[in-house]
């Protein structure tokens, strides 16, 4: 939080920082966990670790953060954290000993998942390389923070939107106010480096991110066997960063320094498990926990529509295969796909088409067996919002592989419910009797999803209700 406040002060009072604002727009959320911070706790007051919760959204604060992000859809995201000083160890790393684990001031790495656009990943690695150089020149000890393809973690989550996403970690947890100025300075140096690079390469970054997001939308409209989703990513050791870092340690006995060999970071480059991207996911409307599932999807920015009761569609159903074993130990589950068959939904069903910017997030939620997020409630199954039938082994979850699902996967039942959202050239003007009663927890996005079938149409509601809705981010109940 303090590092963010320093950056705000810089942009208000420092001419060099103010000049950057001619090239970039910056949104700063200084702290999303004030209750936990007050209690010196990583978790929220309700016990949720928000940096492991970006997919399941147990914490209301994260749902609000996601809503704020979607207002801007920024091309670059900096996720700032502190790490813990873990004590001192012997060379065998198994017992307390002479040397502290590390003396890093700063650890930082970009999102590098194989589900992200390669051009965006390349920009992230170039920016991290600059940040390493800037930190070293500032007299700081900088290191890699490893990689993560664990989707519930912030750095990886925003990467699924093809943002250039970074984790910035500085020493702090458990340190109280010890070396406080140096810790805040470390945050400032890293954030300044990334923002300066973004300003210098603004056009390149904006074009790359826009192209990546457009590509995701286009791929989601047409089924291609070559277009796969990464479910379990590993490292061959052959794909390395072109920048290196060394670990510095100090003796707790005499203060002597020990420096490791400078090494690059090995990146995830191998698809150990994958599955072809569908054009839509389908969940029956009478599925247990459907309201919670829709809450999650709403706050992930997912567009969806409902099929009428009695609709029949040609789909593949997911089923439980068994534990997925790695080196003799279970690492989550493995799912399979039934042959394509006609399925009739007595109560209707919700369709989540993949021709949208949020499609990577939708896929990582709906695929039951994303090994990358095993143990962190990254999928609807891992979060136990859906489960397989213990007799048939089937999940209440289907995929569609026909092209252009918004026009080919539509209602054909007898219900009088509307089929799917329309996209008029101009917003239709509702009659005076078209009203909606706002309830606690509503947002314009959520209301638009329910009433218009598409959350991104929230601006239509806002434009028609400016007299009563003074701010699009605050609705009074």
Kindly give the residue locations of the regions a language model identified:
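Structured catalytic-domain cores with a bias toward divalent-metal coordination
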Residues: 1-430
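Soluble periplasmic/extracytoplasmic beta-strand elements of cell-envelope proteins
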Residues: 27, 435-439, 446, 460-463, ...
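Glycine-centered loop/turn positions within well-structured domains
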Residues: 35, 445, 467
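Glycine-rich, flexible loop/turn motifs
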Residues: 44-46, 50, 448, 465, ...
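Extracellular LysM carbohydrate-binding repeats and other cell-envelope/extracellular binding modules
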Residues: 454-477
């Amino acid at each position: 939080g303090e590092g963010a406040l320093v950056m705000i002060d810089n942009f208000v009072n420092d001419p060099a920082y103010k000049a950057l604002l001619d090239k970039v727009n910056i949104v700063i959320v200084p702290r999303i966990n004030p209750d936990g911070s007050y209690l010196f706790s990583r978790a929220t007051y309700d016990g949720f670790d928000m940096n492991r919760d970006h997919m399941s959204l147990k914490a209301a604060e994260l749902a609000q953060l996601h809503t704020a992000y979607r207002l801007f859809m920024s091309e670059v995201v900096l996720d700032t954290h502190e790490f813990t000083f873990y004590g001192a160890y012997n060379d065998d790393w198994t017992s307390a000993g002479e040397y502290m684990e590390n003396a890093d001031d700063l650890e930082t790495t970009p999102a590098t998942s194989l589900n992200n656009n390669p051009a965006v990943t390349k920009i992230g690695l170039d920016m991290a390389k600059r940040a390493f150089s800037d930190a070293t020149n500032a007299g700081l000890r900088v290191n890699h923070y490893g990689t993560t393809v664990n989707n519930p973690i912030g750095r990886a989550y925003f990467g699924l939107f093809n943002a250039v996403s970074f984790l910035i970690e500085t020493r702090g947890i458990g340190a109280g106010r010890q070396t406080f100025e140096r810790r805040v300075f470390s945050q400032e140096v890293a954030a300044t480096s990334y923002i300066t690079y973004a300003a210098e390469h603004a056009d390149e970054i904006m074009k790359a991110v826009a192209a990546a997001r457009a590509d995701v939308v286009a791929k989601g409209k047409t089924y291609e066997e070559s277009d796969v989703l990464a479910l379990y990513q590993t490292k061959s050791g052959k794909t390395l960063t072109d920048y290196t870092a060394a670990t510095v340690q100090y003796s707790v006995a005499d203060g002597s320094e020990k420096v490791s060999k400078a090494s690059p970071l090995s990146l995830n480059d191998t698809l150990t498990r994958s599955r072809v991207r569908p054009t839509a996911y389908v969940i029956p409307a009478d599925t247990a926990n459907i309201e919670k599932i829709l809450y999650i999807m709403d706050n992930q920015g997912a567009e969806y529509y409902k099929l009428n009761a009695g609709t029949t569609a040609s789909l593949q159903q997911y089923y439980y295969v068994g534990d997925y074993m790695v080196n003799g130990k279970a690492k989550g589950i493995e799912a399979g796909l039934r042959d394509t068959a006609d399925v009739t939904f007595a109560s209707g069903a919700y369709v989540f088409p993949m021709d949208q910017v949020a499609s990577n997030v939708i896929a990582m939620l709906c695929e039951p067996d994303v090994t990358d997020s095993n143990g962190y409630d990254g999928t609807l199954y891992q979060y136990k919002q859906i489960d397989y039938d213990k007799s048939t082994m089937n999940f209440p979850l289907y995929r569609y592989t026909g092209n252009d699902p918004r026009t080919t996967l539509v209602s054909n039942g007898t219900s009088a419910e509307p089929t799917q959202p329309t996209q008029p050239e101009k917003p239709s003007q509702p009659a005076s009797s078209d009203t909606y009663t706002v309830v606690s927890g509503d947002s314009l996005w959520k209301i638009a999803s329910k009433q218009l079938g598409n959350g991104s149409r929230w601006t239509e509601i806002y434009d028609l209700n400016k007299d009563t809705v003074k701010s699009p981010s605050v609705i009074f109940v």
